[in-house]
């Protein structure tokens, strides 16, 4: 059966769902196509993929109706920042009070953001969710585009939006070229328990190998770390024993929060800049990582 919509959003992650939620007061017919259904069960241990949401991001999420769902699940406000250079006196620190703000932002798991947005989108009568489903073909015409999904669904859309990540299927289908370069670093992420409480302060140290950030989570002695370092060293850090990793991490962070203890998995991913030459082409638009990564 053919379905006609005004906008088909490929990708139901944070960006795609935020875009769909932004049309909540419009008469436009929206379809969101996502290849997987997010697990709604939150483990006691936070996911290793988190985002630092600014106050501006909070304002947007409040307008979309998703902020309450984020706070009800899990969000960690941070009230101060400390940044320093290893083996140097260079240091900067500031807090929300000095800026007349209630906080500087929140550290939130990406999946929590996705679930809170999904909760809102599911309430919208003008949005249809196709989860799980993937686009298999796309044909772009002068007045509309035609899509087919792997579940047999066919649809037409006046605009197709790619919110399908750094390796965007839509961007590749449209042969949109990329400007890209490799930073020569990998980001290692993990959850870490610290001997001393973080006091809701985000901290980052710049070392000869690259920056290391400790982002405060909801539990007073739990941080999400982002460790940017050379690929070979990142691989070493991934495979070394927990005991060796804890010792290395504590030393690299100048023992600022006492002895560190990794909890759960460690993961790493390459840091690469990707920038689509065109964000908008005939009846197609790219948003989020599909348009540009860090």
Predicted stretch roles:
Residues 15, 38, 167:
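Conserved Rossmann-like nucleotide-cofactor binding loop
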Residues 65-66, 167-202, 212, 220-221, ...:
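Central beta-strand plus flanking loop segment that forms part of the substrate or channel wall
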Residues 45-86:
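N-terminal FAD cofactor-binding segment of flavoenzymes
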Residues 20, 269-294:
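Conserved mid-domain beta->alpha element of the FAD-binding
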Residues 24-48:
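Glycine-rich FAD pyrophosphate-binding loop
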Residues 73-173, 181-186:
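Conserved N-terminal helical subregion
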Residues 207-270:
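Conserved FAD/dinucleotide-binding core of flavoprotein oxidoreductases
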Residues 5-32:
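N-terminal Rossmann-like FAD-binding beta1-loop-alpha1 element of flavoenzymes
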């Amino acid at each position: 059966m053919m379905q006609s919509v005004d906008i088909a959003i490929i990708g139901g992650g944070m960006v795609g769902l935020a875009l769909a939620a932004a049309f909540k007061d419009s008469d436009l017919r929206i379809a969101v196509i996502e290849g997987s259904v997010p697990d709604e069960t939150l483990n006691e241990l936070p996911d290793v993929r988190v985002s630092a949401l600014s106050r501006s991001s909070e304002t947007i999420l409040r307008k979309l109706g998703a902020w309450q769902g984020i706070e009800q699940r899990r969000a960690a406000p941070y009230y101060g920042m400390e940044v320093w250079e290893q083996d140097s006196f260079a240091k900067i620190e500031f807090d929300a009070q000095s800026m007349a703000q209630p906080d500087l932002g929140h550290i939130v798991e990406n999946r929590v953001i996705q679930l809170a947005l999904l909760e809102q989108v599911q309430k919208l009568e003008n949005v249809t969710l196709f989860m799980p489903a993937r686009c298999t073909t796309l044909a772009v015409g002068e007045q509309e585009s035609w899509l087919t999904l792997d579940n047999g669904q066919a649809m037409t859309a006046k605009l197709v939006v790619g919110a399908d990540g750094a390796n965007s299927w839509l961007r590749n289908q449209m042969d949109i070229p990329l400007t890209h370069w490799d930073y020569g670093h990998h980001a290692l992420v993990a959850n870490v328990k610290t001997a001393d409480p973080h006091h809701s302060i985000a901290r980052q140290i710049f070392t000869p190998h690259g920056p290391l950030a400790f982002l405060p989570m909801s539990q007073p002695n739990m941080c999400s770390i982002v460790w940017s370092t050379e690929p070979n060293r990142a691989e070493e850090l991934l495979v070394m024993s927990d005991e060796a990793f804890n010792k290395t991490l504590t030393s690299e962070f100048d023992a600022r929060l006492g002895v560190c203890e990794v909890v759960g998995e460690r993961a790493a991913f390459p840091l690469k800049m990707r920038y689509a030459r065109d964000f908008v082409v005939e009846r197609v638009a790219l948003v989020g990582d599909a348009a540009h990564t860090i």
